[in-house]
Amino acid sequence: MAKGASISGFPEWLPSERVVEQRVIDTLRKVFELNGFIGIETRAVETGASLLKKGETSKEIYLLSRLQEVGHESDTPIEERLGLHFDLTVPLSRYVVEHSGALAFPFKRWQIQKVWRGERPQEGRFREFVQADIDVIGAGDLPDHYEVELPLVMVSALEELRAYGLPKATVHANNRKLSEGFYRGLGLTDVEGVLREIDKLDKIGADEVARLLTETCGATEAQARACLELAELTASDGAELAAKFDALCEAHGIVKDSEAYTLARQGLDTLAMIVDEAAAIRPGSVIADLKIARGLDYYTGSVYETFLDGAASLGSICSGGRYDNLASQGNRKYPGVGLSIGLSRLVSYMLHTAGAHANRVSPAAVLVAVWNEEDRPAANRIANQLRARGIATDVAPTAAKLGKQIKYADKLGIPYVWFPATAAEGAEGAEPAGDEVKNIVTGEQVAADCTSWEPDTVVAQQTVEI
């Protein structure tokens, strides 16, 4: 990453690092479009009222002000001010409502775009970063099968990135109805508060979460222990999940004919369906993990977190869930389900831990040498002929000594240097009898015609390696 007068949390990739990021973006887009998702881009700003709908605190929102407004921001309510979007879900919900008449539903969209979040920067966490999202939005209703399909699409995309050093990814799924029903069955009423504290489990540990449950959510010690017992449940198939959950309900006196159990069972059935159907298509890719809470209060059903094997310190790299109430227009609701990858964080891991790197900085496969400036038009004609045939080509920036031009190509990783035959009299070195091209990696130099010469496809390709 570029150093110098940097601003904490605002990364700038070096050219070679940008190649890796672009390859990740291209890979994700390819997989998303193979699965029928449509790309969109939304504006960078939303109103404060829209941004606060998701339950974020205003401390994490970057608000915009013109210079002449500095010092007078308090005159305008935060709901009426403009701020940079901190995710892509809030802009999507607004976009769908505004353009509903022009969209076909269910609307399957992918979006890869920068977002801004005013949180404390740390290793792998940024204030400005790229997110990669897929969502499906329905008009009025949305079938449950999308709650299986979306995590499988993300797993498929992450599997493609294993070629660049990414470990195997596993989606951990839960359902908010299951958790809410269980908490209500215990007699707890601050369900949102309990979910927010359970969401901190991996960060602060069970003892601290238990303390917060009793101090902030009104739970007794027994209720707090029961919440933690639920969070410990995992299962790889629906039958195992149902058996473990029913045993826990019985142990804590949650009867099966209660409203709380009925609500929990709705979530359990959906979660079991997700795990079983995912296992039939891609075994081991999705497991039930009842500690997954997603502390944001707009999720209404399935919730997901995605973890990489052997990278526990990285935490979740892809998360999301089902939301039924985020977007509406009059009496019509637009329920959705979506997943989001913190792409910048993922790229940072790939660069600095997995060792992903570009084989060269420049996309050009050929550098056309310039004997002297009078011959630059001829060099440009050769370059244009090669480009017209799909061969990425650059032209030497100056008519420097030939050795310097070759060193320039080498520094950029350009594998071929083209020597034009139309050298002017007095150029350094012997003038070639015709055009020649040199592979500066192997040293091989051969006669070449820009209308027919083909580079070695492996040598010419700009790639990401590990």
UniProtKB/Swiss-Prot annotation:
GO terms for biological process: histidyl-tRNA aminoacylation. Its EC number is 6.1.1.21. GO terms for cellular component: cytoplasm. It holds the Pfam family HGTP_anticodon. It is found in: Cytoplasm. InterPro entries: aa-tRNA-synth_II, aa-tRNA-synth_II/BPL/LPL, Anticodon-bd, Anticodon-bd_dom_sf, His-tRNA-ligase, HisRS-like_core, HisRS/HisZ. SUPFAM superfamilies: Class II aaRS ABD-related (SSF52954), Class II aaRS and biotin synthetases (SSF55681). This is Histidine--tRNA ligase.
